[in-house]
Amino acid sequence: MQYRLPVWMGIAAVVLAACASLQPVETGQKLIGGPQSTVRDTFGAPTETYQLANGTQRWIYSKQPYGFEVYAADFDASGKLASFRQMLTEKEIYEARPGVWTKRDIAERFGMPREPVQYYSLMKREAWSYRMYVAGYQPAHFSAYFDDAGVLDRTMIIVDSRGGDRSRAK
């Protein structure tokens, strides 16, 4: 009897930690309004940080190259969490502005690529690639192509018809 409470407290701690890793967007959104320390305690150290032009500080949590997610925690000027979201979505990608955005803009939005950067000499374009899911959890690759001046030329989403990691697990 006397051991039940510590056991249940231990189980509750494990379940809460699992929720943060299994449902990071929902967990992060519950922290909105909280300080940076709470976000760091929940998700750990960010993989990258950026000071955005509007004064927002963005923490990137990348699961690349093996995962399919990049999360952004945006903090206001007072250091309070203002938003937490998954960045590798079609909605976020379609906001990219070819001819306007630069490598810096893509990095601030999606983090630096964790897959090898490719250079296509015939196109004279550098490509950054990210793994993502499209509708119905279909594995895909998002690529951003830059000209030699570092300006975004185009973006592309290519669906992985083989099923991503599932086809390689056999």
What spans do the regions from the language model cover?
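Bacterial signal peptide processing site
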Residues: 20-22
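A short acidic/small-residue loop/turn micro-motif
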Residues: 88-91, 159-161
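A cross-family detector of function-defining hotspots
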Residues: 24, 28-80, 98-170
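C-terminal motif of bacterial Sec signal peptides marking the signal peptidase cleavage site
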Residues: 15-18
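Bacterial N-terminal signal peptides that target proteins for export
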Residues: 1-9
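Short, contiguous, helix-prone interaction/anchoring segments in small proteins
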Residues: 11-13
